[in-house]
Swiss-Prot record:
Pfam families membership: Defensin_big (PF14862)
Organism: Argopecten irradians
Name used for this protein in its record: Big defensin
InterPro entries in the cross-refs: Defensin_big_dom, Defensin_big_N, Myo_ane_neurotoxin_sf
Subcellular localization: Secreted
Family named by the database record: Belongs to the big defensin family.
Record-level GO BP terms: defense response to fungus; defense response to Gram-negative bacterium; defense response to Gram-positive bacterium; killing of cells of another organism
Cystine crosslinks: C88-C119, C95-C114, C99-C120
Propeptide, residue positions: 29-34
Length: 122
């Protein structure tokens, strides 16, 4: 059996909770039912963006706003672009689909940087 003072304490506590719930409702009437529309930053309008940025924009502004602004998802860099037009062999060669007349193909190690292309050195 509980003590009378403890019962009074609990009853006062729950009464205070009920009074607070009546006086301070959890949902304020001042908050509008629909959110205000937020504009996408001008830097992203009509742009093709990376997948991470696209997901962030959709989360922040909504899919309809992102589509209306013309923001598109940039395609994954295709193989020819990711393997062409950069140096190889310690900056002494260049990745190309075919070596030029004054170049020879390097067949040493670490050819993964060129992918399907050839590392052409002078």
């Amino acid at each position: 059996m509980t003590r009378p003072s403890l019962v009074r304490c609990y009853s006062l506590f729950f009464t205070a909770l009920i009074v607070m719930a009546i006086i301070c409702p959890a949902w304020s009437e001042e908050i509008p039912k629909s959110r205000k529309k937020r504009a996408i930053p001008i830097a992203y309008v009509g742009m093709a963006v990376a997948p991470q940025v696209f997901r962030w924009l959709v989360r922040a502004y909504g899919a309809a706003a992102v589509t209306a602004a013309g923001v598109t998802l940039r395609r994954v860099i295709n193989r020819s672009r990711s393997n062409d037009n950069h140096s190889c062999y310690g900056n002494r060669g260049w990745c190309r689909s075919s070596c030029r007349s004054y170049e020879r193909e390097y067949r040493g190690g670490n050819l993964g940087v060129c992918g399907s292309y050839k590392c052409c050195v002078t």
